[in-house]
Amino acid sequence: MILSGKEILKHIGEDIVIEPFSEERINPNSYNLTLFNELLVYKNETLDMKIPNETEKLIIPEEGLLLEPGKLYLGRTNEFTQTNKYVPMLEGRSSTGRLGLFIHVTAGFGDIGFAGYWTLEIFCVQPIKIYPNTEICQIYYHNIDGEYDLYNSGKYQNNNGIQPSLMYKDFEK
């Protein structure tokens, strides 16, 4: 079952943390998150899962940044989120989707106990200009049935910024 906006609001500061938080961004069953003013792009055209891939930082100026199709941009939310009771899910807003802008390629599913900024896997189907602090995606929360363990992976937990893939660490096990 998905939490309503009113339920999200009720649990803010307790079971759900969203910082900074603005009540104006509550929807009937989600909360709008905003785009930070930095992006990462991979330097090499060919990526390797077994090694750290080099990235380059781009700043999104107030006047906007033009994204190119066929290129992956890693961004992040301005908001730090945490939940110890609900399953967080991230989805692009329909307004961004209707512009051909994808906010996540595969990683829209969060784990109970995740604490950090959401890394966005941004991809566009045609050139599009983006702006910092835009309400770009939404987070919503599911109840979970049964016993569970909190997320405790060290890879992405308590991140401070945009996280490129750390898949290479899986090969070190």
Swiss-Prot record:
E.C. number(s) listed in UniProt: 3.5.4.30
Family note: Belongs to the dCTP deaminase family.
Family annotation (PANTHER family): DCTP DEAMINASE
Name of protein: dCTP deaminase, dUMP-forming
HAMAP family to which the protein is assigned, alphabetical: dCTP_deaminase (MF_00146)
Binding site for dCTP: 93-98, 111, 119-121, 138, 151
Subunit structure: Homotrimer.
Pathway: Pyrimidine metabolism; dUMP biosynthesis; dUMP from dCTP: step 1/1
Originating gene: dcd
Keyword Nucleotide-binding recorded: yes
Source organism per UniProt: Clostridium botulinum (strain Eklund 17B / Type B)
